[in-house]
Amino acid sequence: MPSDIEIARAATLKPIAQVAERIGIPDEALHNYGKHIAKIDHGFIKSLEGKPEGKLVLVTAISPTPAGEGKTTTTVGLGDALNRIGQRAVMCLREPSLGPCFGMKGGAAGGGKAQVVPMEQINLHFTGDFHAITSAHSLAAALIDNHVYWANELNIDVRRIHWRRVVDMNDRALRAINQSLGGVANGFPREDGFDITVASEVMAVFCLARDLADLEERLGRIVIAETRDRKPVTLADVKATGAMTVLLKDALQPNLVQTLEGNPALIHGGPFANIAHGCNSVIATQTGLRLADYVVTEAGFGADLGAEKFIDIKCRQTGLKPSAVVIVATVRALKMHGGVNKKDLQGENLDALEKGFANLERHVKNVRGFGLPVVVGVNHFFQDTDAEHAKLKELCRDRLQVEAITCKHWAEGGAGAEELAQAVVKLAEGEQKPLTFAYDTETKLTDKIKAIATKLYGAADIQIESKAATKLAGFEKDGYGHLPICMAKTQYSFSTDPTLMGAPSGHLVSVRDVRLSAGAGFVVAICGEIMTMPGLPKVPAADTIRLDANGQIDGLF
């Protein structure tokens, strides 16, 4: 079968105005970026307020492995399949970050015959949203240091400036730096560092804001430093919010593209789920719900990260509620969770599959614990055997009383996911329970962290380092104790040890640091060795990305 980029390049794309027309977006509401990409105007989005909303379907997954799960591919395939069976469906996805595109993970536009296109533009600069977010964050950093340089009227303690810088790249060399060296004209030297743009609080605010006014208000709440008498300093205090909102004004308009089958997809915002809250923008999700019968959206990595944050942060703040949840699993990945090495995955191994099933089992039980109906989508690979798929379906039926459906959308497009689409509609139109959360926000911050660790991760307890404990106490003293928790931890395990696969229990979740995201409305708990600035692998994807003799991109995946 051709590569993803070859399939995408061979597709005949519809003019974006035709795609928009299918869901009731008039041509005058589009800001076109070429023939096949457009932004949807703020005014049109506001005109949709009060309209009936469709049903929301959340796609999540088992704990990811290098074998690959295909969550975005399944999201696209399911959206195409829903359209094929007569439902008006829109997909809502996150924008890819340049860091993983040139690192290990690759792009985030789906795969095979279940892709969003134009794939190359989406995976690279797209409409410049990440550039705008990086620029707004960098403007804030410049204004903070400028305020300190010119008399420091706010009495900012330069030892307690929390606002790090960002760049949309994996670059471990920038994790910790010394800035303002070279003499008094360059400011006050201090330690600083960079995070990847998707970990910026500006990205989180961008994705949780309801409109421009809410965006500016949230930006103003961001705590960037402390005074010498330990009082919080916000971006509003340094008068950064107006200019930052101007930089983000156009970016806040959702991006409209299409699938290979010509169905509409909104791609907007892109926080990672291991170091941020992992969901696309609220504006895109709510716009889709007011235009379609079904919105299919994804939450990053496994259900312990993306889905938990989707519910405990995004749904809690907005009132959204999924009508159905799809948990994506693969035979290959479950065998890895059962102890099989990646190079040995080709052969049939029912014992390893059953052992690795514990990972899927916990994810299903966790999602059901939120009161949500679940179906398992088994993403089919050519190397899978019929016996393995039969075994997995049997395990789901007997142990969990949940339906598992084999999906072949990667090879067949929407036609390969029609059975999954029918199951999703049945769940979404069936009995719905009230949404429940993993914790009560009025409990202490440490208790909320412990609730996530013990209820969802299978941990025995949490271990909070003294520095983090002191900061948590300070957050509560300053009035932020009511905020929900955003766990930053490895995506590869329920624990904080990425090598501990399957469904470990009885472990300790180590919290080494915490960060306040007052504008986004949560507290980030940084667990284990997770980094908010990733590094490149030994052999990065960038090594094989180039232009061919015809000026076309080769090696992007």
Swiss-Prot record:
The keyword Ligase applies. Pfam families: FTHFS. It is an enzyme of class 6 (ligase). GO terms for molecular function: ATP binding; formate-tetrahydrofolate ligase activity. It catalyses: (6S)-5,6,7,8-tetrahydrofolate + formate + ATP = (6R)-10-formyltetrahydrofolate + ADP + phosphate. Keywords: ATP-binding, Ligase, Nucleotide-binding, One-carbon metabolism. ATP binds at residues 65-72. It comes from the Bacteria. GO terms for biological process: tetrahydrofolate interconversion. Pathway: One-carbon metabolism; tetrahydrofolate interconversion. Transmembrane segments: none annotated. InterPro entries: Formate_THF_ligase, Formate_THF_ligase_CS, P-loop_NTPase. Disulfide bonds: none annotated. Its EC number is 6.3.4.3. Belongs to the formate--tetrahydrofolate ligase family. NCBIfam families: PRK13505.1. HAMAP family: FTHFS (MF_01543). This is Formate--tetrahydrofolate ligase.
